[in-house]
A protein has these predicted regions:
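Polytopic alpha-helical membrane-helix bundles and their juxtamembrane interface segments
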Residues: 1-226
Length: 226
């Protein structure tokens, strides 16, 4: 019951955050986002407490970093004169992705062959898509960094799906990875494609919070494998 209650709390607080995000600025935006972030970390802790294990603790560390990233990225909008907020937020999210990857490999074991295939698939797919839309988007000097990020994002998502099928990884983690994939690709179009609209931001944030909830729920499933 507690897990259901926390899931509802994440959904409600995220809905309030998204509502305020597309309509206003200021402390209420950061406060509601922080509440949603704290809620999905707490949900992860509760899920992990039912079946603790090394992989689950690594995943929980990733969720905490996601919470830190959330708070600092929104603080960077409230206090744009503090450039360190943006850097800390981006670094926290980068380490969260690394923590999730580490947790998956602790839970299921690392497969160089399947990861290599996923990496090749990710690179080919990202290159094909971004080159196809390049003329419609303004990447500036960030085109190749965007290609690298999109390649890794696609590769890890594909790898998690493979490990769900052959390695017994929690299905909720693969779903979460897929939602993160959608959310982050939307960000590319928001930043470089002139799609910074209320509708796109709502879609981006909705898939992001849904991804974090899926990650949190998966902690018990991850821990059961180690």
């Amino acid at each position: 019951m507690l897990e259901y209650g926390l899931t509802v709390l994440v959904a409600v607080s995220a809905a309030f955050f998204i509502f305020f995000k597309v309509r206003t600025k200021g402390g209420i935006v950061t406060a509601t986002k922080a509440l949603a972030a704290v809620s999905f970390v707490t949900l992860g802790f509760v899920a992990l407490s039912k079946s603790p294990g090394k992989a689950g603790f690594i995943m929980l560390f990733g969720l905490v970093l996601g919470m830190v990233g959330d708070i600092f990225l929104d603080a960077s909008h409230v206090c744009p004169e503090e450039p360190a907020f943006l850097s800390v937020g981006m670094a926290a999210f980068a380490i969260e992705h690394i923590a999730v990857f580490a947790a998956v490999n602790v839970a299921c074991g690392f497969s160089p062959m399947y990861f290599g295939i996923s990496l090749a698939f990710g690179a080919a797919t990202a290159l094909a898509v971004l080159f196809a839309v390049r003329k419609k988007m303004d990447f500036g000097k960030l085109f190749y960094p965007a290609v690298i990020y999109a390649s890794l994002l696609t590769a890890t998502t594909a790898y998690y799906i493979v490990m769900t099928v052959i390695g017994g990884l929690a299905v909720t983690l693969a779903i979460g990875a897929g939602l993160f994939f959608i959310s982050d690709f939307i960000i590319l179009f928001i930043l470089f494609g002139g799609k910074d609209t209320a509708k796109m931001n709502v879609f981006n944030l909705s898939t992001y919070f849904a991804a974090q909830v899926m990650y949190a729920i998966s902690l018990g499933g991850l821990a059961a494998k180690v």
